[in-house]
Regions:
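Active-site nucleophile elbow and catalytic-triad environment of alpha/beta-hydrolase enzymes
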Residues: 218-233
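Primarily recognizes the serine-hydrolase "nucleophile elbow" in alpha/beta-hydrolase
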Residues: 146-205
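N-terminal cap/lid segment of alpha/beta-hydrolase-fold proteins
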Residues: 29-73
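Cap/lid segment of the alpha/beta-hydrolase catalytic domain
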Residues: 82-143, 149-151, 200-207
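Short beta-strand/loop motif that positions the catalytic acidic residue
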Residues: 237-238, 243-246
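Short beta-strand element of the alpha/beta-hydrolase
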Residues: 65, 75-85
């Protein structure tokens, strides 16, 4: 399982505007460059169309994605969905939320489901400690999401004032960054993710990791990337509303730590803890859809339709025996 790796350590609170500009420049891109959208195919699911597409990434290469479109002319709300990074899961890709997006479409939602960098062909994960590729992948995930906003808002059937982001685990952190970077979003659902490096760094696990890799090396790396702390962004999400969903049965994201993350997030916000594993559960899905329905002014989705969405499951832990 990959949750956001803590990047900031011993951060200082500097005066506002200059610090904001310095942080935000890391996520700049050319909004006027061509999206170069390529349609690969389309599948009909009842009255919903699922387009298999790709678009140009500002970081180079292509962003594979699904665009889920309801029937009718709109204007529709829009949601970007960010999948988890759970090792061993068949849904470590844009398919995680596909059935949920199709179920929500008739309520009046166009959805964009992205394959984030780890899920793309040719991506080679770098498992070494404190490597630069993890920084590159994180920034690319954020910028590719912002480019996804450009794609959605270029559609004539999308209402620019009703845009939300749903992110799970690693991409909950992506949403945390976006909440303080891109003001085009009205609402965020952040599911079972690390939302503050300063909170994470108080954990025994991270202090043990610091000792293992070497305090001097660790501290130098963290100082270099002090701007990449989710908490410094999600603490400035206002006026967007942030709904945090956490699971009670997790080893690292304990209920106490979850509440500490929630305390960092700006108002307005909601927090709920579920009796679930990292995959969360059907109750969380019902709450998520209810939140999006309220925030984006959607039609109601029948309970039986929500209940028909299959449960996401945690893959089995790797065996330590042969």
């Amino acid at each position: 399982m990959r949750i956001a790796f803590p990047i900031a350590f011993l951060l200082l609170s500097l005066p506002g505007f200059a610090q904001d500009a310095d942080m935000l420049r890391h996520f700049d891109y050319d909004q006027h460059s061509s999206l170069d959208v390529k349609e690969i195919g389309v599948e009909k699911r009842g009255g919903v169309s699922v387009y298999d597409i790709s678009y140009a990434s500002p970081a180079g290469g292509r962003v594979p994605a699904y665009v889920v479109v309801p029937s009718g002319k709109g204007p529709f709300a829009a949601v970007i969905w960010g999948h988890w990074y759970m090792d061993g899961s068949e849904f470590l890709n844009r398919k995680e939320f596909l059935t949920e997006a199709v179920a929500l479409a008739p309520a009046g939602v166009v959805s964009l489901l992205i394959d984030y960098p780890i899920a793309r062909p040719g991506h080679a994960p770098d498992e070494t400690d404190l490597n630069e590729n993890m920084i590159k992948d994180r920034v690319q995930a954020i910028v590719d999401s912002r480019r996804g906003v450009d794609l959605l808002l270029a559609r004539k059937d999308v209402d620019a004032h009703r845009l939300a982001f749903v992110g799970h685990s690693y991409n909950a952190a992506t949403g945390a960054f976006l909440s303080g970077i891109d003001r085009r979003f009205k609402a965020f659902v952040l599911m079972a993710g690390s939302l503050s490096d300063q909170v994470s760094m108080r954990s025994k696990e991270m202090q043990d990791y610091r000792q293992r890799v070497g305090p001097a090396k660790f501290d130098a790396f963290m100082a270099k990337y002090a701007w990449l702390d989710q908490g410094k962004y999600v603490s400035r999400a206002t006026p967007a509303t942030v709904f945090m969903q956490y699971a009670s049965r997790e080893p690292f994201l304990t209920p106490q730590r979850d509440r500490e993350y929630a305390a960092v997030v700006s108002e307005p916000k909601l927090f709920k803890l579920y009796d679930a594993t990292h995959a969360l559960n059907a109750e969380a899905r019902r709450d998520r859809i209810a939140f999006l329905t309220e925030q984006l002014n959607l039609k109601s989705t029948p309970p039986q339709v929500i209940a028909s969405v299959p449960e996401l499951v945690n893959p089995p832990e790797p065996s330590t025996t042969k």
